Curated annotation (Swiss-Prot):
Record gene name: rpmF
A Pfam family matched in the record: Ribosomal_L32p
Residues annotated as transmembrane: none
A GO CC annotation given for this chain: large ribosomal subunit
Name this polypeptide is given: Large ribosomal subunit protein bL32
Organism (species): Caldicellulosiruptor bescii (strain ATCC BAA-1888 / DSM 6725 / KCTC 15123 / Z-1320)
GO BP, one annotated term: translation
Record-linked NCBIfam families: rpmF_bact
Length: 58
């Protein structure tokens, strides 16, 4: 595999990493309890997924 001829400077590294951004998670509203949740996952608040009780919340 090819190897770099010279080491990247700190400035070049920081400029390169300046474009690394975190993405905001996509949230949807739970149809049962109307809390925000991640899509395609069980609601952590009420335990429902696709209108079925999947997890018992005690």
């Amino acid at each position: 595999m090819a190897q770099p001829k010279r080491r990247w400077s700190k400035q070049r590294t920081h400029k390169h990493r300046a474009n690394w951004k975190l993405e905001i998670p996509n949230l949807t509203e739970c149809p049962q309890c109307h809390e925000m949740k991640l899509p395609h996952r069980v609601c952590p608040n009420c335990g429902y997924y696709r209108n079925r009780k999947v997890v018992n919340q005690d």
